[in-house]
A protein has these predicted regions:
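Small-residue-centered hinge/linker elements
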Residues: 1-98, 104-169
Length: 169
């Protein structure tokens, strides 16, 4: 069986007196469009990008939606998936002239941070973790080689550590 999108349904979190609604979108877990395996291993849940696109497509038809609450708890994910989700939410909010409120539960790192930038207001707990986290950086040190072949260099910089990734340092 291939990936599928579960039936999207409207859930009333708190009964109100009017018809207006807030669209709740959860970005929970790694951001990717790879389908997730279910416990049986046969079925697969759809990837996050497709799921959010489907939510926004359905919400496009509901004129009672007056705002979006984007609830993020993600360590990040792929750049492309994060970028697509960011732009899908920005496009939806601009088409419908809505505000997007972001709530960071525990973590919005890397791609989670990127997606959060689609919001107008970001609300975080003081102990929530956020930021762009680089997992790996490689620095090549050519200082010894350049000395052997007689190449000299001069670095012009505006601050002490501006050249920290320079291969000549």
């Amino acid at each position: 069986m291939g990936p599928h999108i579960d039936t999207l349904e409207e859930k009333i979190i708190e009964e109100g007196s009017g018809p207006l609604k807030v669209l709740l979108i959860d970005v929970d877990g790694p951001i990717s469009n790879r389908p997730k395996k279910t416990l049986t291993g046969f079925d697969r849940e759809t990837g996050m990008v497709d799921r959010i696109r489907e939510i926004l497509k359905k919400a496009d038809r509901d004129k009672n939606i007056k705002g979006i609450l984007l609830r993020i708890n993600s360590p990040g994910g792929t750049v492309t998936s994060s970028d697509i989700i960011y732009h899908e939410i920005k496009s939806f909010k601009e088409r419908h002239n809505l505000k997007v409120y972001v709530s960071v539960v525990d973590i919005a790192a890397s791609g989670g941070y990127y997606v959060a930038m689609s919001g107008d207001t970001i609300i975080m707990h003081p102990t929530s973790l956020t930021g762009s986290i680089g997992v790996l950086a490689i620095k090549v040190n050519l200082k010894g080689l350049m000395g052997k072949v007689g190449v000299e260099w001069e670095i012009v910089k505006s601050a002490d550590k501006k050249d920290f990734m320079s291969p000549f340092r």
